[in-house]
A protein has these predicted regions:
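Glycine-rich phosphate/diphosphate-binding loop of Rossmann-like nucleotide-binding domains
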Residues: 151, 158-176, 228, 234, ...
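Glycine/serine-rich phosphate-binding loop and adjoining beta1-alpha1 elements at the start
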Residues: 79-260, 381, 385, 437-439
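A conserved regulatory-domain signal marking ACT and ACT-like small-molecule sensing domains
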Residues: 1-91
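Short glycine/serine/threonine-rich phosphate/pyrophosphate-binding segments
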Residues: 22-23, 135, 151-153, 217, ...
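Rossmann-like adenosine-cofactor binding region
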Residues: 304-365
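Adenosine-phosphate binding glycine-rich loop
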Residues: 235-236, 346, 351-444
Length: 459
């Protein structure tokens, strides 16, 4: 098993001779030294020299140094500056609260604030349901984390996890028009987390739990679902399960392995793995084999209808293997059987790379970069809030899966997560399922389902 390094993205500002083939020689050198080329931006074009910003993706800082050493040997190229593209993008954060109205005069001020706002307050005193018309509560969600399970970084704390939570908020705003408000908790006590969420729930139309370690995340989700009258989702559980099942359905189209007939093995039974197992059981009617590092995790899997197994048994007998352990390199090439479907979903590095799995005989192999929760949660939340659903039912998640499968191009495992039409389709499917499940508190007419862009329905 290899040591894990995190990918590093840097921008090289390069001054190169304005001659045919020089740029090609530079990008070839980058590729030959094991780095990937990202965006190339022209800064200036001159008679003798051109200046370009070239994004490169390397394994670590040592690899970057080796790359720069090789580039320096190109006589026609000078590296003027090395910049951290990711840090530059995150400067001052990725989100901010903005007004939906302008205050440009005293008349505006009197309407937006005092004394005019008192009329709206009195209306809500008489009937709190007017909040759906006169506040942004229905289209705001709390994104709550205690920082104990941040991506592949683990227990790094809430503040260190804020860039991840900001990213979720930015994406759900762009793709679904929903205000995601980061809530960083300075506690890991499950009772305090539940109580905090309950105390602030009046501010929001829904609550998304994020990056909370198992097993506490299971108890927190179940308790909030039971005690709140607004929808609650844990993206690491249901969000991951939705996109994984959708991608497995897509994989069956060109692997020849049908989910309902396949033996499925789950390696890793934390928030993601356990939820994937529960979804697969509901979808296929068949239990999955499951293994994990702790007996408690395996016991929970069995309690939810799964079968206790081992890494060796799963790799030797399962048609489909889904790994969510967070342990890079756990699955060795020699373990892969010809024709298997391998989903190694841990980030930033998978249990086995798709290339290695395919080389070992896997019919289909992918990782967590390709199977991305982003294809699911924006549309799930949009449809849920549009229907003013009191909860998110399994049928609503299945409706999201169906929409994702239908939106996926032939030969692909998942659709483009940045396609606005995808999230609109998911939202419509989820909203219709909310109506059918009788958890919708808002009736939606045909005009809503015929909308071609995401916009708020009549309230």
């Amino acid at each position: 098993m290899r040591n894990v390094d995190y990918e590093v993205v840097r921008t090289l500002r390069c001054r190169n001779l304005n001659a045919p083939g020089v740029l090609g020689k530079l990008t070839t050198t980058i590729g030959q030294n094991g780095a990937s080329v990202g965006n190339i931006t022209t800064v200036s074009l001159g008679h003798n020299f051109n200046v370009r910003d070239i994004d490169v993706i390397v394994r670590n800082k040592e690899h970057l140094g080796q790359l720069l050493s090789q580039v320096s040997k190109l006589r026609e190229v000078t590296v003027l500056e090395v910049r951290d593209a990711v840090l530059n993008l995150h400067e001052n954060g990725k989100i901010k609260m903005i007004n939906t109205v302008s205050v440009n005069s005293m008349d505006d001020l009197r309407k937006v604030y005092t004394p005019g706002v008192a009329e709206v307050c009195k209306l809500l005193v008489d009937d709190a349901n007017w909040k759906d018309y006169y506040t942004n509560i229905p289209y705001s969600i709390a994104i709550i984390t205690d920082g104990t399970a941040i991506l592949g970084l683990g227990n790094i704390g809430s503040v260190a996890g804020m860039p991840v939570i900001e990213g979720k908020a930015a994406l759900i705003q762009q793709l679904a028009g929903i205000s995601g408000i980061p809530i960083l908790l300075d506690t890991t006590d499950q009772n305090e987390i539940v109580q905090t969420a309950k105390h602030i729930a009046l501010t929001f139309g829904g609550i998304q739990l994020e990056d909370i370690a198992s097993p506490r995340c299971f108890v927190i989700l179940e308790q909030l679902e039971r005690e709140l009258n607004i929808p609650v989702m844990h993206d690491d559980q249901q969000g991951t399960a939705v996109v994984t099942v959708a991608s497995l359905i897509n994989a069956s189209k060109f692997s020849g392995i049908q989910l309902q007939e396949a033996k499925i093995g789950l390696i890793g039974l934390g928030a993601a793995g356990l939820s994937i197992g529960k979804f697969l059981l509901r979808f296929t009617g068949n239990p999955s084999l499951g293994t994990a590092r702790t007996e408690a995790s395996i016991r929970r899997h069995v309690e939810h209808g799964g079968i206790a197994s081992s890494l060796e048994e799963i790799m030797q007998t399962a048609d489909i293997v889904v790994a969510t352990t967070g342990v890079a390199g756990l699955i060795e090439s020699r373990m892969v059987r010809k024709g298997q479907v391998i989903f190694a979903l841990s980030n930033p590095y998978p249990e086995i790379t798709p290339e290695a799995a395919r080389a070992a005989g896997a019919a289909v192999a992918t990782d967590g970069k390709a199977v991305n929760n982003l294809v699911g949660y924006p549309g799930i939340w949009r449809g849920t809030l549009d229907a003013k659903a009191s909860s998110i039912t399994f049928e609503m998640y299945m409706a999201a899966i169906s929409a994702i499968v239908d939106a996926t191009a032939d030969g692909e495992l998942a659709p483009n997560p940045l396609d606005p039409k995808l999230h609109l389709t998911v939202a419509h499917n989820v909203a219709r399922a909310a109506l059918d499940s009788r958890v919708a508190q808002r009736q939606l007419d045909n005009d809503y389902f015929e909308n071609t862009t995401i916009k708020q329905p009549p309230r």
